């Protein structure tokens, strides 16, 4: 199992490598009890998402769900349980801080919008879902995915230009804290 360290950089755009209709960059990776990390280049991309300088971004104006392209990460879980996804992203402003996200099915709008807290350059952020919340208060923070043993796909759809995804890690979710009486 390969582990990739997270790298902190500043946001920057460069010459894009545009996605083709379907571009496979990596095979399925196993997610063990300790988790699994992926660089953005491990995704299968469809336009208008693009890969440049080792990050994924939307090449067009704000996209509706059906127009945002896809970044698909294939992985396999060896231990059933609850998982969360930690990322390294750049979300510099309110117009550049969201993706659509789901596992094993296309995301649904607006429930599965991931509103990313603003960053100063590339920073770690855990995926959440808007659900019944709004752009400043997601309902599911963090979003915990219950996964069975076997093959899975993480689907990320572009939503706002300028939101950059550098890497991600699928990790076992920490145990839930008991409710305070």
Description of each model-found segment:
Residues 20-181:
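Extracytoplasmic
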Residues 7-16:
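Bacterial N-terminal signal peptides
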